[in-house]
Amino acid sequence: MTSSNSTVPDSRSETKKFLVLLLGSIGVVYGDIGTSPLYAFRESLRPFTANGVQHEHVVGLISLMIWTLTIIVTFKYVLFLLRADNDGEGGTLSLLALLMKKTGSYMPVLFFAGLIGSALFIGDAMITPALSVMSALEGMKLVTPAFSDYVLPLSALIMVGLFAVQSKGTGAVAVFFGPITVVWFLAMAWGGLIHIGDDWTILEAVNPINALWFITHAGWAGLIVLGAVFLTVTGAEALYADLGHFGRKPISVAWFILVFPALALNYLGQGALVLSNPAAIENPFYLLYPEWALFPMIILATMATVIASQAVITGAFSLARQAVHLGFLPKLMIRFTSETNTGQIYVPAVNMVLFIGVLVLIFSFGDSESLATAYGISVTGAMVVTTLMAFQFLRSIRGKSAFTAAILLAPLFSIEAVFLAANLLKVHDGGWVPLALAGVIILVMWTWTKGSRYLREKISKNDVSLDTFITSLERSISRESRSAPVLVSGTAVFLTSVPDKAPSVLLHNLKHNHVLHEQNVILTIWTHDKPYVADTDRVEITRISKHFMRLDINFGFMDDPNVVKALPLCKKKGFKFEIMQTSFYLGRRNLIATPNTGLPRWQEDLYIALADFGVDPSAYFKLPPNRVIEIGEQVAI
């Protein structure tokens, strides 16, 4: 009886936890894709408006939208990619880390694919807030045309407020994201349902034959339209990127029981409305609703778009943290805004870049119609990259042959490649914007990675073996020779990225100060290609000699690299740190560009600028400021 009764609370607790994750996934994961009906069908129809919209065009478009959602989101992301996790974490960089760990080698093609996918996602994080919020507010034009002049300033004002609150954390308001988004999806389903009866022939769109007919008969205009059709799956990458926050099951269940049905019903309703009333092409989404519901829907849409914007901003913060830990970006200041949820972070540098980018996009494009042309490229590009990496996943992780992996992914890749080609046709109409943004981000990450690798190779030429150095030093101390340093009480910690070489800061300290602490710790901080490291594996201590020991602290690429919090774990390994008796020695390198080196001069200058932009290691690793001693050195690159 006892064991039977004890399982009931456990079962209820698990159910409650699942429902919380389910609700959260609806608000965060599906916020972006849930706002696509605001503009996707409207923009897809635009090329046909000049000659009049034909029945087969509407049915074909809606069929294409529904089956794009089915193939791309359902099959690729929900049923396949959600299973391609790195210890529970998803996303482009997480998949890249998993593949590089499995292959055990540096693969340039894989590396650049990861950079391209990440860069395109950052571009998406700029365009999504601008496009979605403007689309929502433009509905006010249906209430009163006089509101047209206020769309831009109000959109900018909302963005100012959204980015301003990032530093405070979103935990307090995030609890409302799920319920608001659930109401939004239900409202979309209702709007579609009440209009499907306007023209029952719209149900023919469920047949994929109509989608194929549209592709083969719509001609050049059809290829252009494909770029707009892909707007229906914007935000699909969030399913994979947020896998670690919510888990596969809640994300999958939310898609099948609410999100997909609501989207399909809304698109079917918009199609039936336009078939029965061609004038509704002006704004088919808002015209689904009765006049009394229009203003509430505009308010609800604005809240939904803000939530969608928050989702991509959070995703950009998370991606930046992964990029820093994996060595693709310099160390950035990362602040945790929640004591219980490590996924809630704030990255000031990324926040500022996104904020400036969003405002520039809002005032440069002026309306959602113009900005929509720029949107598809970043989304399709990121998806194509993910599919290419999925090919390597099937080979390296699942053990499939290259032929089998190609057969499995060829249909998906072909579809996405066609969509990408369609979007590339819009380069001159604004599509160059996400490409330019991605190009800049790729250049930054590539320069940092290449420069860091070159700097390590150059410094290593002058390295001194740690074991040889310590043996010589201990011998001089035991013999009390004149060259022996003065021993002082306390513990000194010397940070180094190369544990088998004597840290340059240790050498400089002995050279200039001629002192050595009674206990000296050679500390190396490792960031592993898995999301988290358990506390039991966090620290490793090795005694080298009487006065020296080696300490390795292990973090995952999603962990908070807090050294002070990790040090107490050393007590279980036989060494207790007294923080107030411990000094942390860091080397500060002053980089100087020099001619005739391994990097072009412009890349040297960019690397030095990035190094100056990065946060101090003492702040990044949360070292106590009053216990840190920095010793500088000039390094020519």
UniProtKB/Swiss-Prot annotation:
User: What membrane topology does the UniProt entry give?
Assistant: Multi-pass membrane protein
The protein's superkingdom reads Bacteria
- Which parts of the chain span the membrane according to its record? 18-38, 61-81, 107-127, 145-165, 174-194, 211-231, 255-275, 293-313, 345-365, 371-391, 402-422, 429-449
Q: From the Swiss-Prot or TrEMBL record, state where the protein is found.
A: Cell inner membrane
**GO CC annotations?**
plasma membrane
Record keywords: Cell inner membrane, Cell membrane, Ion transport, Membrane, Plasmid, Potassium, Potassium transport, Symport, Transmembrane, Transmembrane helix, Transport
Q: Which reactions are catalysed by this chain?
A: K(+)(in) + H(+)(in) = K(+)(out) + H(+)(out)
Task: Kindly indicate whether the keyword Ribosomal protein belongs to this entry.
Answer: no
GO MF annotation list? potassium ion transmembrane transporter activity; symporter activity
What protein family is recorded?
Belongs to the HAK/KUP transporter (TC 2.A.72) family.
HAMAP family for this protein: Kup (MF_01522)
Q: What does this protein do?
A: Transport of potassium into the cell. Likely operates as a K(+):H(+) symporter.
Q: What is this protein called?
A: Probable potassium transport system protein Kup 2
From which organism does this entry originate?
Answer: Agrobacterium fabrum (strain C58 / ATCC 33970) (Agrobacterium tumefaciens (strain C58))
Q: Source taxonomy lineage?
A: Bacteria, Pseudomonadati, Pseudomonadota, Alphaproteobacteria, Hyphomicrobiales
